[in-house]
Structure formats: C-alpha cells, structure tokens
Amino acid sequence: MTAGVCMEKLDQICKKFEETYQVKAMAVSIHHHDRCVYTYHAGAKADTLFSVGSISKIMTTVAVLKLVEQGKVELDAPVTRYLKELHIPDERAGKLCVSMLLDHSCGLAGNCYQGKYGNAVNRRHLQQCIAYANQVRLKDTPGMCSTYCNDGFSLAEALIEAVSGQTYAQFITEEILRPCEMKHTDFPLHSLQEGKFLHADSGFDFDYPQEYVNGIGSGGIYSTAEDICRFFDHLMQGNLLHPATLALMNTKHAADHCGISAYSDARYGFGWDDVENPLFCQYGLTACEKSGGTFGFSSHSILLLKEQFSCAVTLCTQKGSPTLLNEELALAYLSETMPLVKRPVSNSLPKPCDMRKWEGVYAYNKGLLRLRKEMDHYVLELDENGTWVRAEKLHTDRSGALVSESGSLLRHHDAQLRLTAADAHVYMVLVTPHPLDSALKRRFVYAEQLIPGEAKKTKWQQLDGHLYLQDDEWLFQRKFAHQPLLIRPHHLEGYGGYLCLTHPLWEQNEREAVNTLRFPGTNAAEIGNLLWINEKELQYGMYHYRCADALPLLEEGEYRFRDAKVHWYRITASFEQLTCYGNARMILLDEKGNVLFDSIYMNGIHDVETACYAGIIMDEKAMVKVQLHG
C-alpha cells in the first residue's frame, strides 16, 4: 500500500470517530523512527492545548527515575526517607517504598480530591494530600495489590520537589520539556491565553472555564498529541533515561499477592496502564500504553520501543474511547508499513469455582451486586440505598460462565461473568470481546464477594435511613456536578459488620469503618475510610459530611461567608430571585444529589420550583441574595 493510501485509511478512521461521537475537538499524532508521519486535527489546531490527565503520570515517572539515575533516590527505599513530613498512622506504612508509588501498589486510598479539580489554581493541594495521608489508615498493605491510585503520584510529585529542591513544574521543564523541545506543554499554575487551550463542555448553559487539575503530577499537565509523541521519541532514543532504566519502566510490576491479578487487564509498569496488551502481543509487538481523563477531556498514548513508534490521541468530548481510537490507528499504520504476522496468544480465562459458592453479595467501588439462584437460572441485582433493583436474568453457558439472556451484561455487549476463587475469596471477573478483535477477550476483576455474618448491634446502625451532605468543598471546585455529594449509609441483612455507602466498609471499631475490597485495576480504587464524629457528622476520606436532618432552612435574605467552603441548607419554598455578587456560587441539588442549578455554569434556574438542598459558597467581599416565593 502506498503512503497516500495509508494516510487516507487513517483519515477515514478519524473522521468516522469524529462524526460518530460528535467530538468537539480532537488531535492525533503518529511518529515513526523520530519522524512525524501522520496528524489529524478537528476543532483544534496543532498547537491547541488539551488537558491530558493521567498521561502526566508518565512525566512524573520519568522524573523520579531521573533522580534514581542521579543517585538521589532509591526505588526500594521507604518514601519517608525523602518525605520527612509523611507520618501515616498505620503500622504497615513502613513498607511503603518509592517504587510502589509508580506501580499503584502503595495502598493509599487514592481519593484526595478536595480542591483538586478546579476552575482556579490551588497551590496547597500537595500539602493537603500529605495532611490527608497523615490522618487516615492505609487502604491496603503496600506492595500487596496494584489498585489504581492517583494519590501515589501526588506523593511522587512531592518527592520530586523535596529531593530536587525545585518545584515540580521547574524540574519537569528543565529535565524533560526543554530537552525534548516540547513547546506546547504547560502546567495549571497560571491563566492560559484564550485560543491556546480548549474549554470543555459543562453540560449546563456555559462551557467550563480553564481547567486546573491541581494534582499536577497525577493528572494536571496540558499538552498536545504532537508533544506527547515528541516526548516518547526522546524517551526511546535514550535522551531522557538510560536503556536499562527505560526497560525497567516498561516491565510489568503489578503486585499480585491477592492471587487474582492473573485474570486482570491491569498490567501496570512504572507509570504505564498496560505493558503487555494482547492486541499487540499477537503480532509480536510490545506496546506500553497510558490513558488520561479529566472533566470533558480524554487522551491515550502508545509507545513501541523496538519499532521506535508512538501514537497519541487527545479529545475534548464526553463520548467515545480514545484508547480504542488510538489502538485502531496504531494497528492500521503498522500493518501497512511493516510485515505483521498474527499468532495466537495466551487468552487464559478464570476457572469457575464451585457453583455452591456463587450466590451472595458482591461489591466494587461504585456499587453492590447480589447474585441469587432461581430455579434453572440466576438473577443479578443492583443495590440502590438498601433496595435491590434492576434484576437481570442470567444462565450458564458451556464454559461455566454466566451470560445474560438480553445479550448485554453490566452494560457490556456479549459479556460473560466468571466466578472464581483466589486467596479464599470469590471474585466476579467480567470477560468481554475486544471491540477491535472479537477473538481476544478483555478481563476485568469487577467485584469481590462479601462474607455473610450475623448482625451486631453497634452505633453505626444509627446512621441507617439518614442522608449526609459533603459540606467542606472549595469554592472553585469543578467536581460538584460529577462526584457524589451525598452518602446514605445503610446495612445489609445477613451481612453484619459491613456498613454500606455506594460500596461496603468494614466496621473496624466504633470510630472507624475501613476498606474491605482488595483486587487489582480500577474497580477497587478510590475508597476512603469513614470516621464517626457524632450521629450528625461524619468524615469520609478527607471530606466532612453533615446529616441533612440537621441542616438549617434556607430563608430570604443576604448570605455572606468568608471561608470559600460550601454551606448547605434545606429548601421548602421555591425561588423568586437569586443573585450572586463577587466570588460567590450557589448550587441546588435534588434529593438524589443531582445538580439542578450551578450559578457558575448556568444563566438562571431552569424548571426548578422547589429543590431539596442549596449550597452557598463564597469568599471575602462576596454575597448571595435570596428571595423566595411566599
């Protein structure tokens, strides 16, 4: 195939994706042997900056490894050797080594979000992450299991600053951006020039303003597809790391002491999401991949060291997978420019455990599932605040897996559920055909079975039936419309000792409920501990929650606060007029926590006569004026 025909094929793939998902903006870059061989842009120019999210972790990883090469850091050394202010109140914390920050096995909760995703810079976020780590127990033993963790890379960012004596941005600029001539990469430390970056769609009336991901080392860098490939070129050529160090970075490091990782697609290297993707392995190719996503942006990058090949996609859209687009583009280019021979690869699937162990309640970080037997089939149900809903009828196929009669299982087409045992636990493993090659099976450890137990009378039961609102988020935080602001603690019959939010926690004692899930990937990620303050107040992770029953009523008048934190009110009357002055913000929630109105992103209150809760946030010299209907 000629080069022109190959480029035409790549154009067709990009245009189809753009039209199918109504993409606001996208950029693609492909490099081969240190040369840009293909680009595609829609809704953006070559130098338009995208928020590339967790691709920032690759730069953080390279920065740590450069310090290792300089003899300033040891990968097997305890993190506290370099972060003197880190004092995690957990007897297991001494096992936390530098390398564990890079392969997601650090055991941290991973949910330090306060002030992280904002419309303004928060220069204290790193200090807040360390302060949070110093308040709570670890989620798991360091080195036990590689469960995706943003907080590990925030600590790596702090380590870079502590060891180098420079800010993270200064070190990355001097050690990576300048040597790689990455002229279109920046940090969320200042206002970017209008027209040089993209505004993501908010889902309300107005687009989001500039995004500030204040956890820069875990996901805050702005860049372009071209700059990402340029970075990878220099990495592959040995301009940033010695070959042996790069080989170490590109090696699978995912911890597997929980015994289930063999059936997980979480094949982490240092920084990388995947270093052994079967989609490429079947052609004898070793691809290292990293994706990224923030509110309104998503991205994906691929590096093939032996072939000196890199490919990057940056998107501004709420739809479509940058991973699948990038993988399709990479294979389309490689298949036309070099001889590829497809060979079968090991596609091992988990062996079903004893069927008598299948029934029960399973949990992951965003929900609870119940599997029960009925006559000649199984039923899978979802927990919704203590009520089992959305029953799905399943039956076993010839391989011993559960499949849905509807053809769709847990919103995945042609999926299987395999129930397998490891380390005395039973897990749900979701198996789906790869969208680009149906002969390949993708595997995700989806949920872990809870252990039944008799109910114990504890003060935690006093929380049942009550609603709690998160009341200490920051004025310019972007996540109000994206993360749950409400929690409804409840207990499950027959499962004493577990306190359920959207996911279960184990009632460690009368003051603390802790994580109970341990398996690799993302479905056991971002789970904090719950601390009892009193019956009306809780702390989950780093956030304070207040019982809705204890909230004051919203009344007419002027509201003035100076702390830039959200204050919640119950609403019993509809609005006649609402006015925000200065750096003030008002948010209305319905009883399920859905955002009905946000004064930053909406022109006026739409179709809302009476909401359930109002949040008022402001700093100095600001005011919110409320006038209610009689």
Where are each of the predicted segments found?
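Active-site-proximal loop and beta-strand segments within enzyme catalytic domains
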Residues: 2-5, 15, 19-26, 32-33, ...
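ABC transporter nucleotide-binding domains
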Residues: 205-206
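Stable alpha-helical elements in mature extracytoplasmic
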Residues: 10, 75, 94, 98, ...
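Catalytic loop of the DD-peptidase/beta-lactamase superfamily, centered on the K-T-G motif
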Residues: 2-40, 166, 173, 210-630
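Short, surface-exposed recognition loops and adjoining beta-strand edges that mediate ligand/DNA contacts
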Residues: 184-195, 260
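Acidic-leg catalytic submotif of subtilisin-like serine proteases
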Residues: 180
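Short glycine/serine- and small hydrophobic-enriched flexible loop segments
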Residues: 65-70, 157-162, 230-237, 315
